[in-house]
């Protein structure tokens, strides 16, 4: 049985003690007995009631630093479990016979460098402030399991998907059409997709209702209600003292965190960001600055075109929930967005290039791990492709796009994106003959019913023509294959194909005469020289 599986068993046992009001107090490797198929906690002599002062037992290096002031608490056991996991998996320095506090530098610790989520997990479990640790053994167990699943998927290449117990699935995708902007904006640049922070905000998952919240039962059943209906229900409940929701009258206007979050979320769905933000600030005062509040703060920041602030919020959520898909997707999306905005600036400040590289590295890391963990997260596949193209790694861009399942509604979009990744976005002289041929081969596999196909044919043929101008010796038709998209792979053949494709597209353009005339003019310009 591996170490992390053993810790899951320990968390289960300690969680049971907590459920009956007891604290184990002395979790450490010496008190864990691992058999072939089970794990046992031994030496129960230090077990005491929660808040039970008196003799405080524990082992330096594993014992929570605040226990003398607070007495035995759930948070103190969480700390000891985190320290135990750290000592068993990474090198912790010893001084005067005890392990020193803290964790080693993640940059110089291979386990952390290879598994950043694991570092975040230990960081939260062993936080100096008990309020920043996992709230329960069950919560920590869920995150340990999620991090373990991600680690196995990344190291084996075999996806390990699972539904989250604290987040909904992703509500929609974002960024799937971005690389097809040259196709969609062929006639009108305004028709091309762009990286919109609001699209990211609306696509991200949202936190599930905490089942321990007093209003959980009613709010869970109403989670998908129309936002106006949600607001009407909450206002009516508030007017009657929340009797219908809580089963008793309360005078407090904020008796439940989840009621307040449902109200803020409803305003966000109605695009009323200012009201939602004001509510979230009020919620922080009444219920504390939990990761759920930070999540919605991040959504507000995205909708207000403040990606830097959103990035900070989502990064805090990731630190609290290191095994969750939602925060990783949010951090990746906002990091890429900031990097794109910085790249588009004409006046680059000193250090901006390094900042862009750092942001893209963060985005690439999370997209990569998300995609390897779950092939249903197609947003991550397209994100990986974009960042690979930005880095000049065109083979790396194709790989995740080819892995998009045929059952996905984005399957044809992924195939089209792979074609564009091979031939567009750089000088034709930098494109290879092999890439042009591969793009054409892939394009022929896309059904003719795909609306973008005719424009993509023009892009591939146009790139081939530009490549021939940059490589004059290639214009004589040497090399295999001898044809491209049904036309001879010579300058004359490619010009003929380009002309024919332009005229076909002109015939299909019936609603905009300017576009039609432009296509005819282009066809006349590129057609091969003839005697008539």
Feature map (PLM): residue ranges:
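Conserved activation segment of eukaryotic-like protein kinases, specifically the C-terminal portion
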Residues: 53-66
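Activation segment signature within eukaryotic-like protein kinase domains
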Residues: 6-7
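Regulatory extensions appended to serine/threonine kinase catalytic cores
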Residues: 154-263
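Conserved catalytic-loop aspartate of Hanks-type protein kinases
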Residues: 77
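Terminal C-lobe "cap" of eukaryotic-type protein kinase domains
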Residues: 131-132, 139-154
């Amino acid at each position: 049985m591996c170490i992390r599986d053993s810790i899951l068993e320990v968390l289960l046992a300690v969680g049971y003690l907590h459920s009956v009001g007891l604290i184990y107090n002395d979790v450490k490797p010496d008190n864990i007995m691992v058999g072939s198929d089970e794990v046992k906690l031994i030496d129960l002599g230090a077990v005491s009631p929660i808040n039970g002062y008196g003799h405080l037992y524990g082992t330096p290096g594993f014992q929570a630093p605040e226990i003398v002031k607070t007495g035995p608490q759930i948070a103190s056991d969480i700390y000891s479990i985190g320290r135990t996991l750290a000592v068993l998996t990474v090198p912790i320095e010893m001084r005067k016979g005890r392990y020193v506090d803290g964790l080693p530098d993640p940059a110089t610790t291979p386990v952390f460098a290879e598994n950043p989520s694991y570092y975040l997990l230990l960081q939260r479990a062993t936080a100096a402030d008990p309020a920043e640790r996992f709230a329960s053994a069950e919560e920590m167990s869920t995150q340990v399991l999620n991090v373990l699943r991600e680690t196995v998927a990344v190291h084996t290449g075999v996806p390990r998907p699972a539904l989250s117990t604290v987040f909904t699935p992703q509500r929609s995708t974002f960024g799937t059409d971005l690389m097809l902007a040259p196709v969609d904006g062929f006639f009108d640049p305004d028709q091309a997709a762009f990286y919109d922070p609001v699209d990211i905000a609306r696509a991200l998952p949202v936190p599930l209702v905490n089942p321990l919240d007093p209003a959980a039962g009613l709010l869970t059943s109403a989670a998908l209600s129309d936002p106006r209906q949600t607001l009407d229900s909450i206002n009516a409940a508030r007017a009657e003292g929340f009797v219908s929701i809580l089963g008793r009258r309360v005078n407090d206007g904020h008796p439940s965190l989840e009621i307040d979050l449902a109200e803020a979320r409803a305003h966000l769905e109605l695009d009323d960001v200012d009201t939602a933000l004001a509510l979230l600030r009020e919620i922080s005062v009444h219920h504390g600055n939990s990761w759920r509040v930070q999540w919605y703060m991040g959504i507000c920041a995205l909708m207000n075109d403040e990606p830097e602030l959103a990035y900070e919020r989502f990064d805090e959520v990731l630190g609290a929930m290191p095994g969750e898909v939602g925060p990783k997707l949010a951090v990746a999306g906002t990091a890429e967005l900031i990097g794109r905005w910085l790249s588009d600036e004409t006046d680059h400040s000193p250090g901006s290039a390094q900042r862009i590289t750092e942001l893209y590295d963060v985005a690439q890391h999370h997209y990569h791990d998300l995609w390897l963990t779950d092939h249903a997260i197609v947003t991550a596949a397209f994100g990986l492709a974009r960042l690979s193209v930005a880095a000049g790694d065109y083979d790396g861009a194709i790989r995740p796009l080819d892995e998009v399942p045929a059952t996905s509604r984005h399957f044809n979009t992924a195939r089209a994106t792979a074609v564009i990744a091979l031939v567009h976005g750089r000088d034709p002289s930098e494109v290879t003959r092999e890439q042009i041929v591969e793009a054409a081969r892939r394009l022929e596999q896309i059904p003719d019913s795909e609306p973008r196909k005719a424009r993509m044919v023009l892009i591939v043929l146009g790139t081939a023509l530009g490549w021939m101008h940059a490589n004059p010796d290639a214009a004589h038709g040497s090399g295999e294959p001898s044809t491209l998209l049904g036309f001879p792979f010579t300058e004359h053949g490619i010009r003929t194909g380009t002309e024919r494709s332009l005229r076909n597209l002109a015939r299909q353009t019936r609603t905009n005469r300017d576009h039609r005339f432009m296509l005819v003019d282009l066809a006349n310009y590129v057609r091969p020289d003839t005697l008539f």
